[in-house]
Amino acid sequence: RDLVRSRGLGDVYKRQAMHGVGDSLGPQLMAELGDVTRFTHRNAITAFAGVDPGADQSGTHEAKSTRVSKSGPPELRRALFLVMDCLLKTMPQDDPVYRFMDKKRAEGKPYLVYMTAGANKFLRIYYGRVKEYLASLEGN
């Protein structure tokens, strides 16, 4: 918390508060992701975190189900899985990430599949909110 205040990121941290992200996971996610503006699009942030489906194609063959790429820092994936675990324990019905994971779980998807899909969706929403906030700062 003190790190966030000392860096002048308290306003960003407070505005971007999402379910499952608290006093310890918020700064950890911000530290692991770094400057969000360096990612050109939302798929770049999920690729960096390693929660995007890996490509498996050659010629006319294209696999429908592939493993996660697992590129990027494992600490970031660990923090994302902790956020997903918090979402599953608190069950916030108004959270789009929880609803998405609950839908995947109801479809009978394996644990790692819906946790990884939830982390992917979380990052895409996080990226959008931070970019929107930074754009509003530039407008002022």
Could you tell me what each predicted segment is?
Residues L9, R42, A119:
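ATP/adenylate-binding site constellation spanning eukaryotic-like Ser/Thr protein kinases
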Residues V4, L76-R77, N120:
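Residue-level micro-sites within transmembrane alpha helices that shape
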Residues T60-K64, Y98-N140:
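Low-complexity, acidic/Ser/Thr- and charged residue-rich accessory regions of DNA metabolism proteins
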Residues A17, D23-S24, Q28-E107, Y111:
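Phosphate-backbone recognition surface of nucleic-acid-processing proteins
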Residues R1-Y13:
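Single conserved hydrophobic/aromatic residue that forms the stacking wall/gate
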